[in-house]
């Protein structure tokens, strides 16, 4: 025997009714099937609206007409396909139900209230019509059926009409006494049962699910399947957390805990019957029948992560009741729980407090007024004689819970939870982990709820080394960086590294997608974007997201962006950049960036500031960390000038060599910036500061390559034309050096006293810079450890590929 229950989203239209009928047929494999159905679509909600509008003397005709229209359309659409359908019989059932509904609503209108007995009759109407329609479909397909009337067969324990529980023993006897033939498909409306007087009552929240598990026990079934609109139970609400993972297996205890603490799955009352009788239950997706679903049983596969899921309850209020004397609290607590229980107010959990004379507990917002009333009544004398402080209620809270199989015995989980919340600056108002060994619950402000849930889920379940990259500047280097990430996709995946491009900005446009920008469409999306990069806008966009390793990658040469680095760091971002402006501005800002990074425990990597892809900065730092000291430095620090001066050796003119360097991408858009020597001076300043010299850019002496009259030329074409005037001068200098067995090189020098100079130098064949050309950089460090032969770093110091690879390397250094 197998029980199949289908919810309202599985029965919203004729296509879904046929689809459900097919699922039923596919399950008729050597075992009997029993079906429990909810009302179609949003029928129950419409019925609730009709009741409330009637009480408030509002026009209900449109609501009733909508309900009637929905059902008539449903059976008409079914009849168009299933000609054998008992159409007139179903139509009469619908008309009779609607007539009964109208009469009941008329009575409510006269009373100006709705007794629970009447409410139960009205809100359960849809389930009976679902059964009538499905029964007719199955009969038209040649199947024999038996319908169980839950009002006659399921006996409830209490006299309540709206939230009843079922007496399983008597109900089971009644149903088994029906002696239903084995070849019959059994159908039963969900959500309802009968009291001792034989009156219809409802089973509360998730009532149809409860009906299914009760029927499973009553029919001695081997499996209960709950068919809904999701693939099963997830590690978190997939509507809130896009990468929530499907849980294929749960224990009964875990399922109860998840449900109790906010997961939108089965209600705890639904699980208790199958837990007691050890009946497995699988949650399946009507729209995706092939999905494995989530199986709840006593033989579940244990979660390797130890943690089952993260749940949340919104609209929670926290009550705090304090005694003046700690000895009185022991007499107060039973009174509190007794009056709350009698009033059927659900205490979600009690809270640990540091004070021994205070008890705190959480309830749902909807019960707050009732709770205050019953508490003031129960504790009247204590409050009157001021043995208690006034009852304190803290509102607008969210309860976040982490469910684990054995959380109390695993302190690492608790430590991780608080570490993650601290990382995103969420203040914990209260903690509870004593009520159950399977969960820890944290009370936070409502505004922190979504961020807290996302942060905990990502921090707990993300097993990859993840970085969220916000790329500013999408010129040649920026585009090459993106290309390299795409090309290394398989390697990154093999190392469990997830680099998500979450933002891309140029001088005009900005796109943002915290789930990751599609690398194939970024150009189109950026061009279509009407937003420009604004750091405040970025912060507003990410405030409800937990970013594991957010990295600003600044591929601009923009001073304004560089001036925001401290703000980036203080807001939780690492920084990777080839932009030299931040490291070559005034010494105070240079120092403040490093202090901010140290304080916030963030990385500020700028390896590409000096040698593009060459590992210059980190190697220099390693030397100094191990006690080495710099005696002398000499290097070719410009790929463009390396190329140009190399071409001069090949008897190519200065102007022609500069044009070639520009066409190959070695120079800035205007080559004047390269030939001014300022770029080399900036790199030299960065190296000098790394060594410990507190210098400013003005302290670097630059031997200008160009006469002063070149400074006013902004047009690139005009500049190249004007440059021809210097061709002969440089040709003569090359010849002069050649006669001496030397070559011209444009170098940066740091001497032992920290004096820095940028100049054209004549180097002989013993100099490590002698053979450097074609865009190569070479840096010779003479130190206490490396002399008389220096440590030389040599390689291409310009070009899109090597610069982008240096940026890529810095990003990976943050993760690895």
UniProtKB/Swiss-Prot annotation:
GO biological process: homoserine biosynthetic process; lysine biosynthetic process via diaminopimelate; methionine biosynthetic process; threonine biosynthetic process
UniProt-listed CDD domains: AAK_AK-HSDH, ACT_AK-like_2, ACT_AKi-HSDH-ThrA-like_1
Gene Ontology terms, MF aspect: aspartate kinase activity; ATP binding; homoserine dehydrogenase activity; metal ion binding; NAD+ binding; NADP binding
Binding annotation for NADP(+): 477, 508, 556, 580, 665, 668, 799
Record's keyword annotation contains Kinase: yes
InterPro entries: AceGlu_kinase-like_sf (IPR036393), ACT-like_dom_sf (IPR045865), ACT_Aspartokinase (IPR054352), AK-HD (IPR049638), AK-HSDH_N (IPR041743), Asp/Glu/Uridylate_kinase (IPR001048), Asp/hSer_DH_NAD-bd (IPR005106), Asp_kinase (IPR001341)
Domain of life: Bacteria
PANTHER family: HOMOSERINE DEHYDROGENASE, PTHR43070
NCBIfam families in UniProt: asp_kinases, PRK09436.1
Protein name: Bifunctional aspartokinase/homoserine dehydrogenase
Record gene name: thrA
